[in-house]
Amino acid sequence: MNKITHFIVHSKVATAIAALLYIGVWIYAIIESGNGGVLSYLNLLLYVIFGMLIGSANERAATGSQRTTLHTTLYYMGCAINPQLAVWQESTICLMLMVAAYRIMATTYRGRTAMGSYFAAFALVGIASIYSPQLLYLVPVLILCCGFMQSLHARTAIAALLGVLVPYWVAFSILYLTDNTHLVQSFVERLTAGVSYAPAALHVPIGKGDTLAIPMIAIQWVWALMLAIPAIIRHTLSGTSKVKTRAIQNMQIGHMGTLFVGMLILPSLYTTMQPVLITLTATIGYGFFVSENKSRGRDIWLITLFVIWLLILGLNVWNSFSTY
């Protein structure tokens, strides 16, 4: 069993297999949906490139290890069981903007001149919120989570708020000059909207001709929690990490918790923030499985995760060939 888990955690072959399965599932989803085209395949390419960048970004931020590729593997696995993201949509833009913002925030640790970084990071959050307006509700908590970086004070908080507001000032100025102010009303309606989407569902056969529809949002939450909770417990109990590394991980955990709570209160956030959640849980969750100490319980947990993933992947394929 230890050899199996070592292969999954440390082998680049495991990452390549996960990436190829993910690409295959998404290409099939694009063809099956009939929404193919340049944008859909560009979307696929962006997710592939982004997955390749996760490892190097984590290593530069001192939150990852060069000895493991598991965070990248988990990212591709999370994408593979969510083929509804294959079609080009706003979530792709939000993913790039939000994770770029997180990386800028990770450079502010004890920074005496962090105002520029806070402004730039939250300007990206502001742009992302133009695509997903209800993200604005999470901004105060995102700012507070930056307190783990020991650089949050009155001036940096003001810089963060200004960063969020500047994209709106530019956008509304353009709308005013082009006589498209009616779009502001559409933005406000989206900001104040409740649950206004039809969640994708996974249909599980429970009998002859009968199926049980499980919302993909529930499946994603279970998958994310199974990854994140053990890692968070280990992170809390372990004192071996560097101080800066722990600060960055605390901020990431705070942001992930903010997204979880936000999605529970405003489920419509799930549509655009789902890929961000996949990325954060992959980044945080891998830490539980890379400990030097051998643990049969950890090995069983990892293999259980992979079995569940294969089951979900298989049900997705079965759903594609079945009619209801």
Segment roles from a protein language model:
Residues 1-20, 64, 297-301:
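N-terminal membrane topogenic signal
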Residues 23-31, 186-218, 228-232:
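Juxtamembrane membrane-water interface segments that cap and precede transmembrane helices
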Residues 45-61:
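Transmembrane-helix motifs of polytopic, lipid-linked glycan transferases
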Residues 68-83, 95-99, 121:
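Membrane-embedded helix bundles of polyisoprenyl
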Residues 101-116:
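Membrane-interface transmembrane helices that cradle and orient dolichyl/undecaprenyl
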Residues 117-131, 260-263:
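Membrane-interface alpha helices of multi-pass inner-membrane proteins
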Residues 138-162:
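Perimembrane helix-loop-helix junctions
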Residues 228-296:
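Membrane-water interface signatures at transmembrane helix termini and the short loops
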